[in-house]
Structures are given as C-alpha cells and as structure tokens.
Amino acid sequence: MSFTDLGLPEWLNESLSNMAITKPSAIQKACIPQIMKGKDCIGGARTGSGKTIAFAAPMLAEWSKDPCGIFGLVLTPTRELAIQIAEQFTALGANMNIRVALIYGGVDMVKQSLELQKMPHFVIATPGRLADHIRSSGEDTIRGFRRVRYVVMDEADRLLTPGFVPDLKTCMDLLPDPSKRQTLLFTATVTDAVRALKDRTGEKGPPFIHEIASDIAVPSTLTQSYLFLPGYVREAYLWAILTHPDNEKKSAIIFVNRTQTAETLRRMLMALDVKTASLHSEMRQQERVNALGRFRAQAARVLVATDVASRGLDIPTVEMVINFDLPADADDYIHRVGRTARAGRKGQSVSLVTERDVTRVTNIEERVGTKMEKYDLIEDDKVVEEYLTPASTAKRQAVLDMEAENFGERKRIQRKKAGLDVDMKSKNKKPKRVAKGKSDKK
C-alpha cells in the first residue's frame, strides 16, 4: 500500500518522497483514511512508528483545499517536541507556502503574539505558553483559534496528567465546540485517562481508535540489557560502556532523573574526551536548541538528558540508550528506550541497576513483557584498574566547577518567585516556631 492509496494528494506524496518516506506505517494506514473521513481519532502506537505523519498528512491534505486562518492546533508537552513537529509540518508543506507558528516558553511573548495575529496556518504549542497568551495577550492574538478545524494532543497521556490539565482546559475552552472540529489524540502509551475519552461520543459518534497490543510495548529490534553495580561506580562503568570498541562510534542518549546529574555527567565526559551535549530544564531555550542541533549533526556523539528528551524526539541515528538512573514509572522507561530502534532499525538499551532499583526493574519487566539480559561486555577488573580513578577525578572537578558557577541558581530564583523555593542551604535547619495565633502562610 502507498500513500496515494490512502487518499493523499499528489503534492503531499511528493513531499513525503522527498523526506524518504515512501511506505506508510501501520498507524498511518489505520488513521489517515479515518481522519480524512472526518472522524475524531485516538491513535496509540510504539514510539518511532510515524505518529506525527499520521496526523499531519491528513490535516495538510484538507488544509490545501482551503488554506486560510489558523487551520489546526497541535498541543504537545515539551518545547523540543514542539520544534520537531513544526519542522515536519514545514517540510511537508514546503511547496505550498505553509506558515507554521511555534508557541512555547523561554522566548519573547510579544514576538509570539505578533506572529499569531498574522494567522499562521498551523500552530504548534505547549499548553502553558498558549494558556499565557489566552489570559494576557488580547483578542487580536487569540481570535484565530475560535475557528480551528483540527486540534491535536500529541503525547496525550502526558497532557492529561494533573500538572497540565489547568492550562490544557484554558486552551480547549477557547476552541470551537467539539462537534465543529476534529479532535486527534496520539500517544505511545494509551492510559486509562486517554481511553476514557472514547466514551464521550457527542453528536459525531465514537472516535476511531487504533491501539497497539500491550505485549509489544517496545520494538522487537531493541535489545534490553542491565548492569548490576554499586551506585558509587556508575560513572566509571558509564565511561567504560561508551568507550568500549563495540560502542565507541555509536551515538547514545544517557537518561538521568535530575538536571544536576545531567550537567555533571556532561562535564565529566567532556573532560574524558567524549564529545557530549546535554538537555535539561536548567538550560535556556536557545542552549537546548543548540544542544539538540549538535547531537543531530553528530558534532556530539552523546546526549545526556532528563526526561525532557524521552518523548517523541525523532533522532534516527541513536543506536544506544543508557539509563544512568532508572525512572520510577515503567511507561517512562518505554519512552526512553524508544529513542533507539526506531522505524525498524536495531538498537540497544543498557540500564545501570543499583540495589535500590530492583523493584523498578521488576515493574519495568512486567510492563514490557520481557526480561532484560545481563550486559556482559564490560570487565569489572578493567573498570577498577583503568576507569575508576579518572572518572572519579573528572566528576569531582565537574561538581566543584558547578558549585563555583552557582549552577541551578536560576531555577532556585524562579521557584522562589513562584513560592516554591527550596533553599538548599536551609535544608538542615529546624523550622522556625510560629507564635500562637499567627498564621503560617506559604
């Protein structure tokens, strides 16, 4: 089956061909015809299976018949994913003079407001920043959203979590009634919150649902491995894995749970002559864009990232994912390892497991449906003799440099302004007593 068979116009087939996309994936075969028939859609598929094309292609096909106003809105949880989706829309619509607006935090709101007033054809946004515009930027900025034909929630399982819901509701309340627009939800993990939406049928009847079987949560081309080790030697083993002859030319993403760890590992690996970039919330937006650009261009072989990079980012060259820290949620593990073994390619994941992680490993294996294999490429004696001291020295210097630079100060200031300050210096101080009868407002 070809994209022509799915009913896409010739100009769009040419754009797909120029992007080296010639055969539709399972989710594209299932969803594109149904969306073009006007149905709402819930699309669940493994990461790397082409979900973005599954909603972008039919939207663009319909837009080309009447290219005016803000035709479609795509909501997504992270800036990086928003940028990637916008790039795909721009590439697909390059021959049709498409106008795509990117709306996310960390850049000037006035500039974004002016861009929205020009009525771009498609808006790719994070809910928080779009909600800010709805609340404060005025009617000229937001009026185009009152007539959108499509709204997409990409990584819908994440958008429907409590942290996003208030801003998401603000965005959705501005849009036309569901009976007057198409609503498309796409995700790699179809949660109960996503699945519950199928019962809200309304006038249009039930949505079309394409859902993967739960027993194939990760690609069959992915090899999942683990290394059981003491926590204090993880850095040495990480360096040993990355520089092993079998891996020294592979591109890799290292996932961690904290921004502090991400920056520490980046500096440590750079000191050990491993070209490394990092991606975490402590970085300014342009720094994040530059880091991703370096990694995509292979100027950096390794990317150290928090879960900001675990969802949706399509970097085809990633051959290995290393979980330096295991995530608490098994679905987050699925999203992480899904950065490799994409679109039928082979890939490998290695999880560094300490004694505290055993329960997490068990939960992950139950969710994924397969056991991790022991990673036996690294010799313990060699790590102790050759890697432990240099890695420890490089890590110690990285920590000292970060302390001297007040790393994390910007975030602490932001949290303080938001009333969420956690003063690291006062963590060990006893709380002040409050006089009887006085309130203790935070």
Swiss-Prot record:
| EC numbers, comma separated | 3.6.4.13
Listed Gene3D superfamilies: P-loop containing nucleotide triphosphate hydrolases
UniProt-listed CDD domains: DEADc_DDX49, SF2_C_DEAD
Example of a GO cellular component annotation carried by this entry: nucleus
GO BP annotations, alphabetical order: rRNA processing
Please give the Pfam families that the UniProt record associates with this protein.
Answer: DEAD, Helicase_C
Q: What is this protein called?
A: ATP-dependent RNA helicase DBP8
Native source species: Yarrowia lipolytica (strain CLIB 122 / E 150)
